[in-house]
Amino acid sequence: MLAHPEVVDRIRSEGHTVAYHGFNHDRNSKRSIQEIKRDLLSAPNSLSKRYYRPPYGRLSWWKATAIPSDWKIIMWSWLSYDFDQTLSIDQLVSRAKNSIRPGDILVFHDNNNTKHRLKELLPPILDFIESKGWKAEALD
């Protein structure tokens, strides 16, 4: 976000929510409450809202006390497994068609290990969502 603000601007201009996942992808179970607080307080100002999804989707109730009251924790309800290189695109799409439900919050990963797969994975999943009459939309 800090290195490429133009990418963040484009993401936002295309209707997506820019939220926070942590400056590093450290497991919160290995971090103190103070470290979590410091991380959130250093979050970029370019966020759409103060939404936070903890790395690995894990945050104990005790560590959740580190989250400032003006932040909202947003978890996912459906994990794409796009990072699992043992699963083919066809397997991932089939899994999506059998398990995505209305209202689900889907998680995909945009990193060096998944970016080549997302180009193939997202279109059939988005087509499936549209064929059901559902709508994929931003959180805000």
Q: Where are the regions a protein language model picked out?
A:
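Conserved, mostly hydrophobic/aromatic
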Residues: V18-H21, Y52, I73, L106, ...
